[in-house]
């Protein structure tokens, strides 16, 4: 499970929100990037009797278009904006940095401007890639960021825009999220059906995190005023090779796995 640190105190998201933090009226929730794995998970676990939901994807709304985003926000006036939209393919970000910054940074800026203008709370989904990853101990919310990739730098820029434009924000950094859609788990399962051998990085460490668990902590936080930056993952740590081993074991699939360094891995890190 995920344990959130709220103002220096541990609070279990499975416990009821204190009465003074509850919202009296139905929340109007705008989920941006709703068809992705986190957006889909939020829609699966939320209570439709508690929340009115607006779902948008790039087909309905271009978050890089400031006027389009402002018009949608002002017309619909959400209570909460959850930004799940992002370019997460690290290789694509390196090849097309302009695209990465437009979506991951400017998109977050535009949504946070709407949040400030309408008084909405803003949830920004971020990543552990805002750190350099060279440390052998876990990073905290108070550590300095130092991204080494275009993806990480663009996501940090998005965080900074959110902090600049609205104080009513929740920035959630997570990693190794799995759920519906294109992710490491599903790529391992696909490889097991199409290959005899798979090379997996054993020098990358993280905490595999259920998209549904992450969705639940988001839905918990938006009912509070505990604004700030959070590291939100499931408990436990492993490397990519160990993660793939467990995925195949649980799925009952057989394929030869070989531990390698990241540069030799068959699968991208996203």
Walk through the language-model features, giving the residues of each:
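Active-site helix of classical SDR
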Residues: 154
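Adenosine-cofactor binding site in Rossmann-like domains, unifying the SAM/SAH pocket
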Residues: 53-69
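NAD(P)-cofactor binding segment of oxidoreductase domains
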Residues: 95-123
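Mid/C-terminal beta-alpha module of Rossmann-like enzyme folds, strongest
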Residues: 217, 224-268
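NAD(P)-dependent short-chain dehydrogenase/reductase
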Residues: 160-208, 213, 219-220
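N-terminal Rossmann NAD(P)H-binding glycine-rich loop of SDR-like oxidoreductase domains
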Residues: 29-45
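NAD(P)H-binding glycine-rich loop region in Rossmannoid oxidoreductase-like domains
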Residues: 66-103
């Amino acid at each position: 499970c995920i344990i959130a640190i709220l103002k220096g105190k541990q609070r279990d998201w499975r416990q009821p929100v204190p009465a003074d933090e509850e919202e009296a009226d139905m929340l109007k929730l705008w989920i941006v990037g709703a068809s992705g794995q986190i957006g889909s998970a939020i829609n699966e676990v939320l209570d439709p009797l508690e929340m009115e939901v607006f779902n948008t994807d790039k087909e309905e709304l271009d978050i890089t278009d400031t006027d389009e985003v402002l018009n949608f926000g002002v017309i619909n006036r959400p209570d909460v904006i959850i930004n799940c939209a992002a370019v997460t393919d690290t290789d694509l970000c390196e090849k097309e940095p302009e695209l990465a910054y437009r979506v991951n940074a400017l998109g977050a800026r535009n949504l946070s401007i709407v949040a400030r203008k309408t008084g909405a709370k803003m949830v920004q989904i971020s990543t552990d890639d805002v750190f350099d990853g060279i440390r052998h101990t876990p990073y905290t919310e108070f550590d300095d960021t130092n991204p080494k990739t275009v993806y990480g730098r663009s996501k940090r820029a998005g965080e900074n825009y959110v902090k600049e434009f609205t104080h009513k924000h929740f920035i959630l950094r997570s990693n190794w999220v799995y759920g519906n859609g294109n992710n490491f788990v599903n790529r391992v399962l696909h490889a097991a059906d199409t290959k005899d051998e798979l090379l997996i990085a054993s020098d990358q460490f993280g905490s595999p995190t259920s998209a549904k668990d992450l969705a639940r902590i988001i839905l918990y936080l938006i009912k509070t005023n505990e604004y700030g930056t959070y590291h939100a993952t499931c408990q436990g740590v492993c490397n990519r090779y160990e993660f793939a081993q467990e995925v195949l074991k649980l799925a009952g699939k057989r394929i030869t796995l070989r531990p390698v360094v990241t540069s030799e891995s068959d699968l991208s890190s996203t």
